[in-house]
Amino acid sequence: MVQGKGLTGFILAIILLQGSLAQSFEENRKLNVYNQEDGSVLLTCHVKNTNITWFKEGKMIDILTAHKNKWNLGSNTKDPRGVYQCKGSKDKSKTLQVYYRMCQNCIELNAATILGFVFAEIISIFFLAVGVYFIAGQDGVRQSRASDKQTLLPNDQLYQPLKDREDDQYSHLQGNQLRMN
């Protein structure tokens, strides 16, 4: 029982130390990204030097004075991507990768996304086929209606005779021959 409490205390101490280590690493960052309300993206360098040099993709962009330690990347709609770094005369920051995905309704097509679409399509076609099979496979037995039982013509009279007409256009069956009564 005593060993179990000691092991639990040891695991708890390790977890707490990892949290404090992560917090101390976060506090030591010298390069931060800020997304402004107007849509612009700012990089802030926290090195204590008079001259700050900005780098993008390893190439120098600009040299600023110490009280101008912010670099405006422009509007986030213009897709400010890249690997940025700031460097003072004595120390330099770690690299920071900035990536904005501006298409809010877009889907990034990778293998997992395409596989998901194909799988969903196959499943939906399967359910549709099962539904059609069960609906079409039912026997045609239906309840008879009153209109099905109603006779429209009496049984003894299959055809209605033509009325006698004198010399009208439709009083003749063939050609110009008159109809005899």
From Swiss-Prot:
Endpoints of the signal sequence: 1-22
Cystine crosslinks: C45-C86
Topological domain spans for side Cytoplasmic: 135-181
PROSITE patterns from the UniProt entry: ITAM_1
Extracellular side: 23-113
Domain Ig-like: from-to ranges: 24-97
Start and end residues of each ITAM domain: 148-176
This protein's UniProt keywords: Adaptive immunity, Cell membrane, Disulfide bond, Glycoprotein, Immunity, Immunoglobulin domain, Membrane, Phosphoprotein, Receptor, Signal, Transmembrane, Transmembrane helix
GO molecular function: transmembrane signaling receptor activity
Phosphoserine PTM positions: S144, S147
Pfam family, one: Ig_4
Topology class, membrane: Single-pass type I membrane protein
Subunit structure: The TCR-CD3 complex is composed of a CD3D/CD3E and a CD3G/CD3E heterodimers that preferentially associate with TCRalpha and TCRbeta, respectively, to form TCRalpha/CD3E/CD3G and TCRbeta/CD3G/CD3E trimers. In turn, the hexamer interacts with CD3Z homodimer to form the TCR-CD3 complex. Alternatively, TCRalpha and TCRbeta can be replaced by TCRgamma and TCRdelta.
Domain notes: A di-leucine motif and a tyrosine-based motif are individually sufficient to induce both endocytosis and delivery to lysosomes.
Entry protein name: T-cell surface glycoprotein CD3 gamma chain
Gene for this chain: CD3G
